């Protein structure tokens, strides 16, 4: 389907699509900033010791469950959109919610009753102090993580009604409320205050979208035609999260290989990855969320899917290029100011370079976030688990070769290569003819954005110091994008505006 054949939509609805994407993206940025503030405060307040090791071990459990919640938003929106069209959205929402509560309640009770045992289990050979802190945090972090899953479900139900702002506000206010709580109570209660703050975060994230759902008349009574099907719904969550969890596993593998390249490189790669992930998710993840419902209603074929991926990636990577250029020039200074002198000098500069080396991963991850919901819109889910397993397996030899050739730089490149292979597999699973069209389109726009970023920020850095070069580079980058708009950016913007 050609771009000029797409339904253009009214100007008001075009503004609605842009507003929805902007609010969703700003919500994700707010959450990321809140997490950064919490991390910086934790580092300055508590340092790096046995207690923080124990808390971070428990926090890893929370992260895995929250990642599943984020993936579930991409999975369930098509289901709820079809339910809305058939007049059974409230019933479908209730069935999913009951299924998740049926797991959340016993899991939370187990985390509370057996907290000491679980604290020792997840901290392994760490000292007893670490296990004690983990045991304090787990009874709060487990229900907090399930709260994020229910919040994702409520946000998806609103998305089925083309309503994105309430959920975006709920997630953003939850992130802010959680970090404020942590800062206020850290002195008197220690690290467990962060676990309490995350629980408050989840409560706020659930509360606002739930109130909006109820006010808009979605009764949560059970519909006779909507069975609970607990195992089916939990299985849908598990296989829907398989590929996102596998891609997170690639990052864990990258950290393991980075550990063999020198002291401190794991930390540097971690921060570079978090920055790169924030840039991509704030744009590509937001576009994926606001497009799933309209694409489900409209229907999409292989050509339409390819067009959707390329156009959405154009918008995402245009912003990512600017962010990456800024980090390359001034990221080290910002990190030093936030995290302290341990990241000053060459360490900070290296972090900026790592973000640049993660450019292939950013392109691949943007394509993944945009493509993945299409698997559920088009009912092409049979190969998700095999693709997830294959990605984990092939990443190890790729990482071995790349690290032996280029060290830490090779580790970042291997992460991008394997992620790209998984994305290409997803595209082939959607439709073989989509693979070629999308690969060509993504390759073309990657070259355009990469050239504009290198010319603008690299050129400015040759004649100016870091901060003035960043400002001048950003201005020149914007000019170059305007000059290149006829190479696809203008059509991509028009496409996104017509989504709603």
Identify the meaning behind each predicted range.
Residues 19-43, 201, 205, 209-213, ...:
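Transmembrane helical elements of multi-pass membrane transporters/channels
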Residues 147-169, 360-387:
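Membrane-interface junctions at transmembrane-helix termini in multi-pass inner-membrane proteins
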Residues 42-63, 132-135, 258-278, 347-352:
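Interfacial/gating helices of multi-pass transporter permease domains
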Residues 170-184, 188-216, 390-395, 408-430:
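Hydrophobic alpha-helical transmembrane segments
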Residues 2-5, 461-500:
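Membrane-proximal transmembrane or re-entrant/amphipathic helices at the cytosolic face
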Residues 117-139, 330-363:
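Interfacial segments at transmembrane-helix termini and the short loops linking adjacent helices
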Residues 70-85, 283-303, 372:
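Helix-loop junctions and terminal segments of transmembrane helices
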Residues 2-17, 192, 210-247, 264, ...:
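Interhelical loop/hinge segments that connect adjacent transmembrane helices in multipass membrane
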């Amino acid at each position: 389907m050609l771009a000029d054949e797409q339904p253009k939509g009214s100007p008001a609805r075009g503004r609605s699509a842009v507003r929805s994407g902007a609010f969703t993206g700003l919500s994700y940025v707010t959450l990321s900033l809140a997490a950064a503030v919490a991390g910086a405060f934790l580092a300055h307040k508590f340092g790096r010791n046995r207690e923080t090791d124990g808390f971070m071990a428990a926090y890893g459990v929370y992260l895995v469950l929250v990642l599943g919640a984020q993936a579930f938003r991409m999975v369930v929106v098509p289901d709820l959109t079809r339910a809305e069209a058939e007049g059974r959205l409230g019933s479908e929402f209730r069935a999913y919610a009951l299924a998740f509560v049926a797991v959340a309640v016993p899991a939370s009770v187990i985390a509370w009753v057996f907290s000491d045992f679980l604290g020792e289990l997840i901290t392994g050979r760490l000292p007893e102090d670490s296990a004690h802190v983990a045991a304090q945090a787990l009874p709060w972090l487990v229900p907090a993580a399930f709260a994020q899953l229910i919040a994702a479900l409520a946000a998806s139900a609103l998305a089925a009604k083309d309503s994105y702002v309430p959920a975006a506000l709920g997630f953003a206010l939850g992130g802010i409320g959680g970090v404020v709580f942590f800062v206020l109570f850290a002195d008197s209660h220690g690290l467990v205050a962060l676990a309490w703050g995350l629980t408050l975060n989840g409560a706020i994230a659930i509360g606002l979208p739930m109130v909006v759902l109820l006010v808009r008349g979605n009764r949560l009574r059970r519909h006779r035609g909507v069975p609970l099907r607990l195992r089916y719904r939990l299985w849908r969550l598990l296989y829907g999260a398989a590929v996102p969890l596998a891609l997170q596993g690639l990052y864990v593998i990258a950290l393991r290989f980075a550990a063999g390249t020198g002291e401190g490189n794991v930390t540097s790669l971690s921060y570079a990855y978090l920055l790169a992930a924030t840039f991509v998710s704030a744009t590509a993840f937001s576009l994926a969320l606001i497009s799933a419902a309209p694409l489900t209603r409209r229907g999409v074929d292989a050509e339409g899917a390819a067009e959707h991926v390329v156009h959405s990636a154009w918008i995402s990577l245009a912003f990512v290029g600017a962010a990456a250029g800024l980090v390359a020039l001034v990221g080290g200074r910002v990190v030093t100011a936030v995290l302290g002198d341990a990241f000053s000098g060459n360490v900070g500069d290296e972090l900026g370079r790592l973000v640049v080396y993660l450019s292939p991963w950013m392109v691949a991850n943007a394509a993944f976030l945009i493509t993945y919901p299409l698997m559920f819109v088009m009912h092409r889910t049979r190969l998700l688990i095999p693709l997830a397993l294959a990605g984990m397996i092939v990443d190890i030899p790729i990482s071995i070769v790349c690290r032996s050739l280029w060290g830490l730089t090779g580790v970042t490149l291997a992460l991008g290569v394997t992620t790209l292979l998984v994305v290409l597999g997803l595209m082939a699973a959607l439709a073989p003819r989509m693979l070629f069209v999308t690969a060509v389109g993504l390759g073309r726009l990657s070259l355009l954005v990469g050239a504009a970023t290198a010319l603008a920020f690299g050129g400015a850095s040759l004649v100016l110091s870091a901060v003035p070069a960043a400002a001048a580079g950003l201005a020149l980058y914007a000019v170059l994008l305007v000059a290149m708009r006829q190479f696809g950016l203008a059509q991509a913007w028009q496409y996104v505006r017509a989504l709603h």
